[in-house]
Design a protein with these regions (language model features):
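Serine-esterase "nucleophile elbow" of acetyl-processing enzymes
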Residues: 4-79, 83
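Alpha-helical cap/lid subdomain in secreted, periplasmic
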Residues: 47-53, 65-175
């Protein structure tokens, strides 16, 4: 760039959600998750370059209700060798009547997916993922830091406990 011209640091950064071309003969791996997984897609892809074809869903996976709606499209028709997946951070989010993030104590804030429904949704999603015959790996939900808008510190522990019950029932390892 010319002197005094700002350089856009994201200008040359590849889109982690863009489709990739498979290298023949390498295992196919699919990442399913939210913005946390979007953040680790490119570094993981670089780390595993030449070892696997690392794909990810073309969007933020959001809550389990979004997963149930889109899972068939995300899986597509090709064979997967490994599926690394997570839902939770958007399930435990408190939403207002207009879809805005709210702290739990604010008027009108309700958890997007109550924990019992989350567990049932995960069970349905795992049943669908198992039909792919891929090796499945669950990723726990990241902790909620203090001051997170729309989320309550400690909720991820409860949601991870619900997820653990599902993964144990299905024999799926947790990463």
């Amino acid at each position: 760039p010319a002197l005094g011209q700002a350089q856009n640091p994201k200008a040359k950064r590849p889109n982690p959600m863009a489709p990739i071309n498979d290298v023949p003969g390498l295992p196919r791996v699919l990442l399913i998750g939210d913005s946390i997984s979007i953040g680790y897609t490119l570094p993981t892809r670089a780390l595993l370059k030449g070892k696997v074809n690392l794909h990810r869903i073309p969007t933020n996976g959001g809550p389990t209700i979004k997963g149930l709606e889109h899972i068939d499209a995300w899986l597509g028709k090709k064979k997967w060798d490994v599926i690394h997946f997570n839902w939770g951070l958007h399930d435990l989010k408190y939403m207002g009547p207009k879809g805005e993030n709210l702290f739990p104590k604010e008027k009108g804030g309700k958890v997007q997916v109550p924990i019992g429904e989350y567990e049932k949704n995960l069970d349905r999603l795992v049943a669908r993922l198992k039909k792919t015959r891929a090796r499945l790996v669950w990723r726990n939900t990241t902790p909620v830091p203090p001051g997170s808008k729309g989320r309550h510190v400690g909720d991820s522990i409860k949601y991870n406990a619900a997820a653990a019950r599902v993964m144990i029932r299905h024999g799926i390892p947790t990463h």
